[in-house]
Swiss-Prot record:
The protein's annotated pathway: Purine metabolism; IMP biosynthesis via de novo pathway; 5-amino-1-(5-phospho-D-ribosyl)imidazole from N(2)-formyl-N(1)-(5-phospho-D-ribosyl)glycinamide: step 1/2
Catalytic activity, as annotated: N(2)-formyl-N(1)-(5-phospho-beta-D-ribosyl)glycinamide + L-glutamine + ATP + H2O = 2-formamido-N(1)-(5-O-phospho-beta-D-ribosyl)acetamidine + L-glutamate + ADP + phosphate + H(+); L-glutamine + H2O = L-glutamate + NH4(+)
GO CC entries: cytoplasm
Subcellular locations according to the entry: Cytoplasm
SMART domains: GATase_5
A molecular-function term among this protein's GO annotations: phosphoribosylformylglycinamidine synthase activity
EC number of this enzyme: 6.3.5.3, 3.5.1.2
Organism (species): Gloeobacter violaceus (strain ATCC 29082 / PCC 7421)
Lineage: Bacteria, Bacillati, Cyanobacteriota, Cyanophyceae, Gloeobacterales
Protein name as annotated: Phosphoribosylformylglycinamidine synthase subunit PurQ
């Protein structure tokens, strides 16, 4: 499986993703600068975390206009896989590839922590390696990670089963106590209707090696590779 990791000015998690896809999983991976407009040959486009363009105006608001985002859009429209992590999730919402928006955290403070997530779906290429309802632990690091959408959009997300991960307590209880940033419906990650575009605020690439305290995130990347092998 071939990965393309998008790099904007201000991205700072691109190398972390490459360490997982190329270093740990031995998958072909290339870094794609924001001025490029061609993703031909890649299977998965990754928009990593960081502070694209310094988060000026709004997180992801400038990055959405980069030439590479036109290539990402074409890739998604062809059914190609796209994942946005943290700032990448913000970019995807700004670009209209995912509904809703990421706004200031409930307490108006930057949150850096390890949080529990409940896996809501396991029928997508991203999550085959998880069990339905499984509680996993991933790191978060964001100041604007509170997911917001109008009630009609939230209802559609629930009806179409587009919520992939929810913040929860370690025992799986979904409530305000287990919600680190005030996201509506405790949404930590969601997909488009087709399931090929995924956005999530937690960082799976930072939980891909036991030496760093956990490997729950690695299974997301392993799911992708396994899905590709199953097709072959």
């Amino acid at each position: 499986m071939k990965f393309a990791v998008i790099v904007f000015p201000g991205s700072n998690c691109d190398r972390d993703v490459v360490t997982v896809t190329r270093g740990l999983l031995d998958q072909p991976t290339r870094l794609v600068w924001h001025t490029e407009d061609d993703l031909d040959g890649c299977d998965v486009a990754v928009i990593p975390g960081g502070f694209s363009y310094g988060d000026y105006l709004r997180c992801g608001a400038i990055a959405r206009f980069s030439p590479v985002m036109q290539a990402v859009r074409r890739h998604a429209e062809r059914g190609g896989l796209v994942i946005g992590i943290c700032n990448g999730f913000q970019v995807l919402t700004e670009a209209g590839l995912l509904p809703g928006a990421l706004v200031r955290n409930r307490d108006l403070q930057f949150v850096c922590d390890r949080v529990a997530l409940k896996v809501e779906r396991t029928d997508l290429p991203w999550v085959h390696s998880y069990r339905p309802g499984e509680v996993i632990t991933l790191p978060i690091a964001h100041g604007e990670g509170c997911y917001y959408a109008e009630e009609a959009t939230l209802a559609e997300l629930e009806e179409n089963r587009q919520v992939v991960f929810r913040y929860c307590r370690p025992d799986g209880t979904i409530d305000a106590v287990g919600n680190p940033n005030g996201s509506l419906h405790n949404i930590a990650g969601l997909c488009n209707r087709h399931g090929n575009v995924l956005g999530m605020m937690p960082h799976p690439e930072r939980a891909s090696d036991p030496i760093l305290g956990g490997s729950d995130g690695r299974r997301l990347f392993e799911s992708l590779v396994a899905s590709a092998l199953a097709v072959v």
